[in-house]
UniProtKB/Swiss-Prot annotation:
It comes from Escherichia fergusonii (strain ATCC 35469 / DSM 13698 / CCUG 18766 / IAM 14443 / JCM 21226 / LMG 7866 / NBRC 102419 / NCTC 12128 / CDC 0568-73). It is found in: Periplasm; Bacterial flagellum basal body. Assembles around the rod to form the L-ring and probably protects the motor/basal body from shearing forces during rotation. Belongs to the FlgI family. InterPro entries: Flag_FlgI. One of its GO terms (cellular component) is outer membrane-bounded periplasmic space. GO terms for molecular function: structural molecule activity. The gene is flgI. Coiled coil: none annotated. It comes from the Bacteria. The basal body constitutes a major portion of the flagellar organelle and consists of four rings (L,P,S, and M) mounted on a central rod. The lineage of its organism: Bacteria, Pseudomonadati, Pseudomonadota, Gammaproteobacteria, Enterobacterales. The keyword Ion transport does not apply. PANTHER family: FLAGELLAR P-RING PERIPLASMIC PROTEIN FLGI (PTHR30381), FLAGELLAR P-RING PROTEIN (PTHR30381:SF0). This is Flagellar P-ring protein.
Length: 365
């Protein structure tokens, strides 16, 4: 009896670990964020603003703002401002956002300001792609960096030309929503997978009756829902908390060619192969020699003669055996045994895939 209970608990723990909620694997089509953007001014900087002689748009924007406030700047006035900076303001309008709610905004310097620390963003309209104003942003900027300079030396920690304003924008216009208008909703998988799409559809059909959900493709599951907003909200709340056993992922190796980083998931396996990796280095050294006559009155001329030396070296290249590996730990151990650098490892993995020894998809970003 004790042995049976132990086996049952082990199977139960394994099932719980492998199961995930539908809400963690999918999103509802049409329920999405929308990007907003605006152009504004930051004031109150401690002499770290734009150099107006190099950023004329800052002065032009300030003149326009002052004229709207009833202040006229005489023509030809050369304003030497140090406490003002032109900025771009971005934000995301969440789905179902209502008028009067607040959202966070990101403020980024547009000119040559040294820092936005201590600045205040003046009222800035935030527009969508349809050029309609959806929110108004204003407030004090929080900058996560710090810096100081004196005597030609400077120290800087993190970025000073960008910051955030928490709850810095008020929503003024609501986006029209089609939620609740139809009798079907589409669930979209975060990662395309035919097996997972079918498994989610089967899970919903077992709970809500067959025909309630249909997998349309490797990413989309169409679900029949009752009409009305409140009914659809209750229906989605139920099915999004359903548990689905996660299928094994595709074996994949991701290589970042810019940073040289290599990342692989646990499904990657290796077949037995032999690898030889050699390094070829070419060194070119050029030196200018000056040749002049020994006798001052001999009539000769001073000549500069270049001397070039080329050194070609090839190191490494010994053939090493890589054993077949069935799990990630063995794969890492086998690749580390080659003693290759991350940059060399990228070439080795590409060659392994071409030879059929790397059992994984290779993605280069």
């Amino acid at each position: 009896m004790i042995k049976f209970l132990s086996t049952f608990m082990l199977l139960l723990v394994t099932t719980v670990v492998q199961a995930e909620r539908i809400r963690d694997l999918t999103s509802v089509q049409g329920v999405r964020q929308n990007s907003l953007i605006g152009y504004g001014l930051v004031v109150g900087l401690d002499g770290t603003g734009d150099q107006t002689t190099q950023t004329p748009f800052t002065t032009q924007t300030l003149n326009n703002m002052l004229s709207q406030l009833g202040i006229t700047v005489p023509a030809g006035t050369n304003m030497q401002l140090k406490n003002v900076a032109a900025v771009m303001v971005t934000a995301s309008l969440p789905p179902f956002a209502r008028q009067g709610q607040t959202i966070d905004v990101v403020v980024s310097s547009m000119g040559n300001a040294k820092s936005l620390r201590g600045g205040t963003l003046l009222m800035t309209p935030l527009k969508g792609v349809d050029s309609q104003v959806y929110a108004l942003a204003q407030g004090n900027i929080l900058v996560g960096g710090a810096g100081a300079s004196a005597g030609g030396s400077s120290v800087q920690v993190n970025q000073l030309n960008g910051g955030r304003i928490t709850n810095g924008a008020i929503i003024e216009r609501e986006l029209p929503s089609q939620f609740g208008a139809g009798n079907t909703l589409n669930l979209q998988l975060n990662d395309e997978d035919f097996a997972m799409a079918q498994q989610i559809a089967d899970t919903i059909n077992r709970a809500r009756g067959y025909g309630s959900a249909t997998a349309l493709d490797s990413r989309t599951i169409q679900v029949n829902v009752p009409s009305g907003n409140s009914s659809q909200v209750r229906f989605l709340a139920d099915i999004q908390n359903m548990q689905v056993n996660v299928t094994p992922q595709d074996a994949k190796v991701v290589i970042n060619s810019r940073t040289g980083s290599v990342v692989m998931n646990r499904e990657v396996t290796l077949d037995s192969c032999a690898v030889a990796q050699g390094n070829l280095s070419v060194t070119v050294n050029r030196q200018a020699n000056v040749s002049q006559p020994d006798t001052p009155f001999g009539g000769g001329q001073t000549v500069v003669t270049p001397q070039t030396q080329i050194d070609l070296r090839q190191s490494g290249g010994s053939l090493q055996s890589v054993r077949s590996s069935a799990n990630l730990n063995n794969v890492v151990r086998a690749l580390n045994a080659l003693g290759a650098t991350p940059m060399d490892l990228m070439s080795i993995l590409q060659s392994m895939q071409s030879a059929g020894c790397l059992r994984a998809k290779l993605e280069i970003i």
